[in-house]
C-alpha cells in the first residue's frame, strides 16, 4: 500500500471578505472601560457591530492602554469607521470603572457623531463574587 500523501484532499481557496457598506443613520456606542483597557463598539439598533476599536488595537501596549489618551484615540478610530457606514447619531452606553470613560464620550462628539443619551450600564453585584484583595503599595 503506497504511503498517503499529505497534499491530498480539496484545496482550500482563500475567500475574500467584502465589507458591504451598511446605511445606518442611528446607532449605539458601547464603551467598556476597565482598569487595563478601553473597548469602543458602535452597533446598529439591533446590536450588530458596525465598527469597533480598543486601546490595544490602536497601538498602545501595557500600562499605556489604560490611559485616557488611548481611550480617546480608540473612540475616534471607531467613530471614523462608523461614519463610513452612515452613522450620524449615537446613544452611548458606558460600562466599567476605568479612566477612559469621559474622554471616549468627548472624542465621539469631536469626531462628528451627535451624542443622544448617555447611560451608565456598569453591572452592580448584589454581593456576588469576592473582590480582589486591596493592593499594598
Curated annotation (Swiss-Prot):
Residues 1-32, 118-137 are annotated as: Disordered. The keyword Metal-binding does not apply. PANTHER family: 40S RIBOSOMAL PROTEIN S14/30S RIBOSOMAL PROTEIN S11. Belongs to the universal ribosomal protein uS11 family. Pfam families: Ribosomal_S11. GO terms for biological process: translation. GO terms for cellular component: ribonucleoprotein complex; ribosome. Keywords: Ribonucleoprotein, Ribosomal protein, RNA-binding, rRNA-binding. Located on the platform of the 30S subunit, it bridges several disparate RNA helices of the 16S rRNA. Forms part of the Shine-Dalgarno cleft in the 70S ribosome. GO terms for molecular function: rRNA binding; structural constituent of ribosome. Part of the 30S ribosomal subunit. Interacts with proteins S7 and S18. Binds to IF-3. Residues 12-21 have a biased composition (Basic residues). It comes from Nocardia farcinica (strain IFM 10152). The lineage of its organism: Bacteria, Bacillati, Actinomycetota, Actinomycetes, Mycobacteriales. The keyword rRNA-binding applies. SUPFAM superfamilies: Translational machinery components. This is Small ribosomal subunit protein uS11.
Amino acid at each position: 500500500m503506497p504511503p498517503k500523501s499529505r497534499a491530498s484532499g480539496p484545496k482550500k481557496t482563500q475567500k475574500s471578505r467584502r465589507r458591504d457598506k451598511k446605511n445606518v443613520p442611528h446607532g449605539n456606542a458601547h464603551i467598556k472601560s476597565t482598569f487595563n483597557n478601553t473597548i469602543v463598539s458602535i452597533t446598529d439598533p439591533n446590536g450588530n457591530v458596525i465598527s469597533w476599536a480598543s486601546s490595544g488595537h490602536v497601538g498602545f501596549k501595557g500600562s499605556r492602554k489604560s490611559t485616557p489618551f488611548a481611550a480617546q484615540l480608540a473612540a475616534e478610530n471607531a467613530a471614523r469607521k462608523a461614519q463610513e457606514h452612515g452613522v450620524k447619531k449615537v446613544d452611548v452606553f458606558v460600562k466599567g470603572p476605568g479612566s477612559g470613560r469621559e474622554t471616549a464620550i468627548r472624542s465621539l462628539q469631536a469626531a462628528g457623531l451627535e451624542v443622544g443619551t448617555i447611560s451608565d450600564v456598569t453591572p452592580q453585584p448584589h454581593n456576588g463574587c469576592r473582590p480582589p484583595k486591596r493592593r499594598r503599595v
